[in-house]
A protein has these predicted regions:
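Terminal ABC-like ATPase head and other globular end-domains that cap long coiled-coil arms
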Residues: 2-167
Length: 167
């Protein structure tokens, strides 16, 4: 009977599952805090054991996601994106080194925000050997991106690649 009780405890909500979830939450929340700080955010996002988020403003008061400005919400979104990407890298046997960001710079961010995001992307390229593809409709945001730039133009429903001389 004692062995059965041990097995029941191990597979129960308080056993191994709880231990693993708590370790994952510790990593998840520390990564989120790391990226929010790098994005110069005044908010803190914390996930609980049910993976429900709680967002604290600069006064450490719980706030709705929708009470934040567009740039602040985008910072929270990107912190979550980078965090889950990092955690995914640690899981499983399949490794990948490509990330595609569609319209990453196209809304809400000022020059400083674009610079902070660019630094994160550059660090991911250097530290994780990640190939980052950024799709943008804003020509001014291309200045922030390093590496090769491919210009596309859509005219009459047809998209074509532009030669650098055509720009």
């Amino acid at each position: 009977l004692a062995k059965l009780d041990i097995v029941k405890y191990v597979v129960s909500e308080e056993g191994v599952k709880s231990y693993i979830v708590n370790k994952l939450l510790e990593l998840l929340n520390s990564k989120l805090l790391h990226y929010l700080k790098r994005l110069d955010s005044n908010s803190i996002c914390i996930f609980n054991e049910y993976f429900e988020e709680e967002i604290l403003n600069e006064k450490n008061k719980v706030c709705s996601y929708f009470n934040f400005s567009g740039a602040e919400r985008k910072s929270i979104d990107l912190a979550c994106l980078f965090t889950f990407s990092d955690i995914r890298r640690l899981q499983g046997g399949v490794q990948y080194n490509i990330a595609i960001y569609d319209e990453l710079f196209d809304s809400s961010f000022d020059e400083k925000g674009i610079e902070l995001i660019t630094r994160i992307l550059q660090d991911r390229v250097e530290e994780l050997d990640e190939c980052s593809i950024v799709i943008s409709h804003r020509k001014e945001s291309i200045k922030a991106v390093t590496g090769d730039v491919i210009y596309l133009e859509k005219e009459n429903g047809i998209t074509r690649r532009l030669d650098y001389k055509e720009i």
